[in-house]
Amino acid sequence: MEPFKTHTGVGVPLRRSNVDTDQIIPAVYLKRVSRTGFEDALFAAWRADDDFILNNPHFRNGSVLVAGPDFGTGSSREHAVWALKDYGFRVVISSRFADIFRGNSGKQGLLAARCEQSDVELLWKVLETEPGTSVTVDLEARTVHAKDLTVPFEIDDYTRWRLLEGLDDIGLTLRQAETIDTFEKTRPSFKPATLPARAG
């Protein structure tokens, strides 16, 4: 996973609340467990509507999604995060996230930045007044910049650290590789052990 420090990209104002994971990616697309190839499934039902925000040329290449409250509710599915990332989003801003979605996002390198709803409204106003406006999200400073507007966002220290370091679950484990190796070498042989996979 790549470290996340700052990101600048086109902001997309999604004026919808209670966006659940089935709206982010419908269940019909969950038949694969690979992490890529889900960009066409993102908001699939809504994108059939010509007036949907991502069908607007100004927002088609957006990478900072500014959504209404209660984003990512519903069932836990990593596919929702994969679809957002595959489309090109690096950041989702909302005043309230479902806990499971927020956790899945941090583990996959997608920043879920919590802003006050009043600040979300200000961001929407900027993005709708000047479609295609770039938004800069600074994880180190915990701020969002758009035009002359700067607003703070919240993220827990642990998730922030993981994103800054670019650590997914495997990366966290590999940081302890030497300790794990030492433990395995000193573990009594009569106890169960994990062996390398055999080819063929």
Curated annotation (Swiss-Prot):
- Tell me the Gene Ontology biological-process terms attached to this UniProt entry: L-leucine biosynthetic process
According to the UniProt record, what class of enzyme is this?
lyase
Q: Does the keyword Lyase apply?
A: yes
The function of this protein is:
Catalyzes the isomerization between 2-isopropylmalate and 3-isopropylmalate, via the formation of 2-isopropylmaleate.
Q: Which HAMAP family match?
A: LeuD_type1 (MF_01031)
* Entry similarity comment: Belongs to the LeuD family. LeuD type 1 subfamily.
Q: What is this protein called?
A: 3-isopropylmalate dehydratase small subunit
This chain's source organism reads Saccharopolyspora erythraea (strain ATCC 11635 / DSM 40517 / JCM 4748 / NBRC 13426 / NCIMB 8594 / NRRL 2338)
